Every structure is written in structure tokens, then in C-alpha cells.
Amino acid sequence: MKDFLIIKACGHKDENLEIENIKSLAELYGMNTKVVCIENYDSLQEALTSNGQYDYIYLSSHGGSDGFCNELRTLDVKWMEFGELICESDCLKGNSILLLSCCRGGLNEVAYDMFWNCLKIEYVVGPRQSLTSSDLLIGFHLLLYNLEHRGIDPIVACDKVLKGTDIRFKCFDRMETESDPAFIARCKELDKLFDIE
């Protein structure tokens, strides 16, 4: 049985409905679910280190190209920090998928920084544009339907979200991304920035 961690970190008025819906959907597909409410960096760290290993991690938050936050700004995490937390906590099973339910969670820079910082991350999925909660919910519904019910590859499942809704979801597969010249350039930039040879 698969395990599905839902991180509730946004605080907007529609978030409870989004989380209840995603939780029900994961359970419909036979997954064990765990919902954690995050208010700051320490509670995020605690949630990732004390709850076991997961096939999916679903992050509900406000997001941008640099990181994610909650509405009150008591939580403000860079994508690289999130990748580091995931790596250190050993919370991912093999072939796990990070579902970033936040604006801009599907940008190249987000996946590149996460992959650079944590070799345990296999897939990163998120929207490439700013969306409402209902748009995000529909997109993730279609994605999970295609992944879990139909058994479709994550990248193809994201393509089906676009075809069905015109919502631009993007899935980054570590194995494919590692040969991308833009990813290689970003890695060199980060290596230089952090003095890694």
C-alpha cells in the first residue's frame, strides 16, 4: 500500500477544502494518508522527520521561483532548503513523487534546485503558472487518476492534465532532467555558489 503525506502550509480560505478533497482522493486509490499542518520551519522539519517514508508528498502553500511560504509568513522556505530537509529526513520511498500545489511549483528552477540538493528526489510535479485552489485541485485530480488508476507514466500523466484543462502542469523526472543542458548549467552555477568542486 502506498503512503501519501499532505503538508498543509498555506492558510488561505480554500485550503481546508483542497486538503480534504486530496486526502479523500488518495484514500479512494487505496493509499494511507497523513495530514500535517505546518506553521513554521521547525514544524516542517518535524513533519518530515517523524512520520516515516512516503510515495507522495503533497505540499499546499504559496509558492514562487525561490521558495514557498504561508499566508502569515511564519513559514518561508527556499526550494533548496526544502530539498535538504527531504534528503536529511529520509522521508521518501523509491520513485516517490513531490506534488507542489502552489503557484509556480512546476518551474524548471524549482525542480533543478530540488534535484541538485537531494539525490533521493525522483519526480517533481507542479503548475507552471499562478492558479486558484480549484484549478490546482482539478489538475491534481487528473494527475492522480492517470497515475494511480490508469498506471500512466508521470510525465504522460502531466501531459493529460494540459490536454484536459489547459492547465500547464510539469513533471520533472530526475533521470531525464540530469542530461538537460539547462540543468547541467544550473548545477555548475550552484556548485560555484556553494564552493563545491
Language-model segment annotations:
Residues 11-14, 41-43, 63-67, 104-108, ...:
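Short acidic, S/G/P-rich loop/turn micro-motifs used as interaction or catalytic elements
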Residues 1-56, 94, 101:
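A domain-level signal for caspase-like cysteine endopeptidase catalytic cores
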Residues 48, 53-85:
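A glycine-rich, hydrophobic loop/mini-helix early in the fold
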Residues 33-39, 124-131, 173-177:
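A generic structural motif
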Residues 76-88, 150-197:
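Caspase-like cysteine protease fold
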Residues 136-148:
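Short, small-residue alpha-helix embedded
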Residues 74-137:
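Catalytic cores of nucleophile-dependent amide-cleaving enzymes
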Residues 21-30, 47-48, 86-90, 147, ...:
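Hydrophobic, Leu/Ile/Phe/Ala-enriched alpha-helical segments that form helix-helix packing faces
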